């Protein structure tokens, strides 16, 4: 665990961050906010995780997901674990995107 985050990650500070994210209205606003908030490697890491979640949801094997995304197999495995036993955040967004694009969940 990161030394900077307490065991209970839902703090007033993290809630404030999520409220700020929810105030964004467009993709351009999100891009601008995250570019200021994160380093390029942090954005790349988040992107790899999200791509991995999408590809794992399509049933691709771990090694292929790693090859396509540039994420390590450790990261792909971690994403797969969170897809199965996480807070259902990945599942929430994956299913929502499927519904809005007309695909079935």
Language model regions located:
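N-terminal helix-turn-helix DNA-binding core of bacterial DNA-binding proteins
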Residues: 40-43, 54, 65
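Short, amphipathic alpha-helical "recognition" segments used to contact nucleic acids or chromatin
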Residues: 46-60
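Short alpha-helical "recognition helix" segments of helix-turn-helix
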Residues: 64-69, 76
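Intrinsically disordered, low-complexity basic tails/linkers immediately adjacent to helix-turn-helix/homeobox/MYB/SANT
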Residues: 93-105
